[in-house]
Design a protein with these regions (language model features):
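Beta-strand-rich domains and repeat architectures in extracellular enzymes and scaffolds
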Residues: 165-191
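Repeated scaffold domains used in trafficking and secretory/extracellular systems
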Residues: 168-177, 213-228, 253-268, 294-313, ...
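Predominantly extracytoplasmic/ectodomain segments of secreted and cell-surface proteins
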Residues: 22-174
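C-terminal motif of bacterial Sec signal peptides marking the signal peptidase cleavage site
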Residues: 17-20
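Entry beta-strands of beta-propeller and related beta-repeat scaffolds
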Residues: 180-186, 228-233, 267-272, 312-321, ...
Length: 456
């Protein structure tokens, strides 16, 4: 399709000379002095994209990406032509069919020839790197240069990327909580004594391990929660607090509390529950009775979250997932409460085919606006599942839980089948932390690429 521009202009001039000679002497024909790209678009692209098989093996699938939603901007001042919305990750742009509308004659710079060569307005072009175009006016007295870039995501926005760091030596994880840019990992040492490991969240974790003091013997570190930048836990039916996670002190008689079941700085409430009922506090030391303990209300193996409603940021939703029995057997319970309501609501429905998964060590965190459940081996929708095989995600605030089927949001393969204590949390920089122990223990930090983009 490419021809020497000189030949093209010579032919173009001869056409106009011929027209002039066959017309009356009073008729004049002028070649256009304009040179510009008026519109640009590309055709649909068929490419191979990463995916995975039903058994979890990596594979490729071929699909066609429609270009209708990817418009191009033509900046006539700078001469740049580009798409604001990048094409999907892994899209092949080595042979792209184009469609130009121009005033003038279009040419493209060819590196191997070190010159601009004529091109048709519907040629296919390699856009793996920006291409230089030049539009000559038909009278060959003027030209304008353009640079065309077809932007493609260099990383898959929806991919969850994991980094592995060394395990926290000598600590069996129970609960992980972030405060002021530091991660606090509560657990036990080899003798079963309570300890806390602390590390900065921004860099590779460098853990400092300290013995926990001030809590009664046998205190359940799984009850630790954060409220108004202070750590709280329940032990022997009472409430204890700590400003540094290391030294703890008595905060309030907890009316036989067995667990902290809700905490929200926005709503200004800390919730505890036990056989005597559910209580709330605004300062962590004075608790007010709210309601009697409902049947099947979870008190053990607690995971909780609190967040504003999408349609009204002034209303806080409390989510609570756990077990009503101390041995944490059977199906987990899912309860919720709005800050404007007076009672907690049980989400259990015997007809629900997508109930919360019953996993060993079940942990639930809120991530990317949804609830993520992970854990050891167990049952999901009545079927046996391996430990850490998948995320189970609820997009309707805890009612339906479905296996994450997307190729990109997967747990690290190294965790598959793991059967050791672990702790899970999400930090303020959108990283999910999974900390496990044992001979293959590690600290995993994962993030969906898109959430990392939003930080920049």
């Amino acid at each position: 399709m490419k021809k020497k521009l000189a030949i093209y202009f010579a032919l173009l001039s001869s056409v106009f000379v011929a027209v002039s000679c066959s017309s009356s002497e009073e008729e004049l024909y002028e070649l256009s002095p304009y040179a510009m790209v008026k519109s640009f678009r590309i055709g649909n692209i068929r490419s191979s994209y990463p995916s995975f098989t039903s058994t979890g093996e990596d594979t490729l699938v071929v699909r066609t990406v429609s270009m209708e939603s990817f418009g191009f901007t033509i900046d006539q001042v700078s001469g740049r032509i580009y798409n604001n919305d990048s094409l999907p990750y892994a899209t092949n742009v080595s042979r792209v069919v184009t469609s130009f509308s121009v005033d003038g004659v279009l040419s493209i710079y060819v590196d191997s020839l070190d010159s601009y060569e004529y091109m048709a307005t519907t040629d296919s072009i390699d856009f793996t790197s920006p291409r230089k175009l030049r539009v000559y006016a038909a009278d060959a007295q003027y030209y304008k240069d353009y640079t065309v870039s077809v932007n493609v995501h260099q990383v898959e926005p929806e991919m969850m990327v994991w980094n592995r760091y060394q395990a926290v030596e000598g600590v069996s994880p129970v609960r992980a909580v972030e405060l002021a840019g530091r991660m606090y990992l509560f657990g036990t040492d080899a003798d079963g004594a309570p300890v806390v490991a602390i590390a900065a969240t921004e860099s590779e974790p460098d853990w400092s391990v300290s013995a926990v003091s001030g809590l009664p013997a046998g205190a359940d570190l799984g009850t630790v929660q954060l409220f108004r930048d202070i750590f709280y836990a329940v032990a022997d039916g009472d409430v204890y607090s700590s400003v540094d996670g290391i030294v703890w002190s008595f905060a309030s008689a907890g009316a036989g509390a067995a667990a902290i079941v809700g905490a929200s700085d926005v709503d200004g409430k800390l919730w505890i529950a036990g056989e005597q009922g559910i209580y709330s506090s605004e300062n962590g030391s004075e608790f007010t009775f709210s309601e009697s303990l409902p049947v099947d209300f979870p008190l053990y193996g607690i995971s909780l979250a609190s967040y504003p409603l999408n349609h009204n940021k002034n209303i806080i939703r409390y989510m609570l997932v756990g077990y009503a029995n101390e041995d944490k057997s059977g199906e987990p319970e899912v309860w919720s409460r709005l800050s404007t309501e007076g009672k907690w609501t049980n989400y259990k429905n015997e007809d629900n085919k997508y109930a919360c998964p019953a996993l060993k060590g079940l942990a639930v965190v809120r991530y990317d606006g949804f609830l993520y459940a992970i854990g050891g081996a167990g049952k999901v929708s009545g079927f046996d599942v391996e430990a850490f095989k998948s995320f189970y995600i609820s997009k309707d605030n805890g009612i339906a839980w479905k296996t994450a089927t997307g190729f990109y949001q997967r747990l690290p393969k190294e965790l598959f089948g793991s059967n050791v204590p672990f702790a899970v949390t999400v930090d303020s920089n959108n990283f999910m932390w999974i900390i496990n122990s044992g001979s293959d223990g590690a600290v995993w930090k994962g993030i969906i690429n898109r959430l990392g983009f939003e930080r920049k």
